[in-house]
Swiss-Prot record:
<dbReference type="GO" id="GO:0046872">
    <property type="term" value="F:metal ion binding"/>
</dbReference>
<keyword id="KW-0408">Iron</keyword>
<feature type="binding site">
    <location>
        <position position="268"/>
    </location>
    <ligand>
        <name>Fe(2+)</name>
    </ligand>
</feature>
<comment type="similarity">
    <text>Belongs to the ferrochelatase family.</text>
</comment>
<dbReference type="InterPro" id="IPR033659">
    <property type="entry name" value="Ferrochelatase_N"/>
</dbReference>
<dbReference type="Pfam" id="PF00762">
    <property type="entry name" value="Ferrochelatase"/>
</dbReference>
<dbReference type="InterPro" id="IPR001015">
    <property type="entry name" value="Ferrochelatase"/>
</dbReference>
<dbReference type="GO" id="GO:0006783">
    <property type="term" value="P:heme biosynthetic process"/>
</dbReference>
<dbReference type="GO" id="GO:0005737">
    <property type="term" value="C:cytoplasm"/>
</dbReference>
<comment type="pathway">
    <text>Porphyrin-containing compound metabolism; protoheme biosynthesis.</text>
</comment>
<dbReference type="InterPro" id="IPR033644">
    <property type="entry name" value="Ferrochelatase_C"/>
</dbReference>
<keyword id="KW-0350">Heme biosynthesis</keyword>
<keyword id="KW-0479">Metal-binding</keyword>
<dbReference type="GO" id="GO:0004325">
    <property type="term" value="F:ferrochelatase activity"/>
</dbReference>
<keyword id="KW-0456">Lyase</keyword>
<comment type="function">
    <text>Involved in coproporphyrin-dependent heme b biosynthesis. Catalyzes the insertion of ferrous iron into coproporphyrin III to form Fe-coproporphyrin III.</text>
</comment>
<keyword id="KW-0963">Cytoplasm</keyword>
Length: 314
């Protein structure tokens, strides 16, 4: 008799609400992870607890309020939809979802899957590119529970992923006369690449190479940037927010921006890119700033997830 199989989709996480107390709880867990902030605990924890968690939750809560919906967090809404659609598509699997930080917790969901009779679990972190700061925390949490569970490290080279990403950009790119396409990835500290040998930067660059090749873009037609810098440390560059300020002065006044590292809308896409970066672009003389949303609840993306699982189970 075949073993009962399961798929666990894992997203980063989201506060329970957009109120400051819930944002504080979320940030404490997220920023307290030594894989996310790789500083000595004796140095970092007093800064986190004594300064950041007293100031940042209220500021972040105001940002969350600008993107929160009647149904809740966009990231939660779309992650739930992705899991449901994948379950509908793959009746041969028990499909669940969890969050690295916040609820539902990875350990709790895996326990529920095992209690229901699932014997073979494949964990798919919802990040096309691997990073020590995103996928590795999932790997470590799963390893503590059951080191026999397979965790998929990345899927940026899966053809259907880059095809779908290119197609989502092509629809807008061809319909408008843009001066520049900006591919904005979530940034990480430079030291994680140079000292910790994080593969993230190279995988982001490979994603861009694949996409612009499919789109047939010349080098001068696109930019590869990094967003969401946090703290004083040097991060991967160029910074998205710096480039969107400079582009209008370089005669690129009509820009299309997308975020290939995100597969669902969240604070970084809906607030940081669509609101904050757009304001900076317009303030510096920009005219058109359009955004290609992540895949969200696209059925085509659900098919990509299904293919990723199959390719990694062979």
């Amino acid at each position: 008799m075949d073993k009962k199989k399961g798929i666990l989709l894992v997203a980063l996480g989201t506060p329970r609400s957009c109120e400051a107390d819930d944002v504080r709880d979320y940030l404490k867990e997220f920023l307290g992870d030594p894989l996310v902030i790789q500083k000595p605990r004796w140095l970092w924890l007093p800064i986190l607890n004594g300064i950041i968690l007293k100031v940042r939750p209220q500021k972040s809560a105001e940002m969350y309020k600008k993107i929160w919906t009647d149904e809740g967090s966009p990231l939660m809404i779309y992650t739930v939809a992705q899991a449901k659609q994948l379950q509908d598509m793959r009746e041969d699997f028990d499909v669940r979802f969890a969050m690295t930080y916040g609820e539902p917790r990875i350990d709790k969901v895996i326990a529920e899957m095992k209690e229901s009779g699932v014997e073979e679990i494949t964990v798919l972190p919802l990040y096309p590119q691997y990073s020590l700061t995103t996928v590795e925390p999932v790997i470590q949490q799963v390893k503590k529970i059951d080191d026999k569970i397979k965790v998929i490290r990345d899927f940026h080279k899966v053809e259907s992923y880059s095809d779908l990403l290119a197609e989502s950009i092509r629809e807008k790119w061809q319909a408008n006369d843009y001066d520049k396409l900006v591919l904005s990835y979530h940034g990480i500290p430079l030291s994680y690449v140079t000292k910790k040998k994080d593969a993230y930067e190279e995988q982001c660059k490979e994603t861009t190479r694949l996409v612009v090749s499919k789109l047939g873009l010349r080098e001068e037609e696109y930019e590869h940037t990094y967003q969401s810098k946090f703290g004083p440390e040097k991060w991967l560059e160029p910074a998205t927010i710096d480039r969107v300020a400079e582009l209008p002065k370089e005669n690129a006044k009509k820009v299309l921006i997308c975020s290939p590292a995100f597969v669902a809308d969240c604070l970084e896409t809906l607030f940081e890119l669509e609101i904050e970066n757009k304001e900076v672009f317009v303030e510096n003389g920009g005219e058109t700033f359009d955004f290609v949303h992540p895949f969200n609840d696209s059925l085509d993306f659900t098919r990509v997830l299904s293919e990723v699982v199959d390719q990694n189970r062979l």
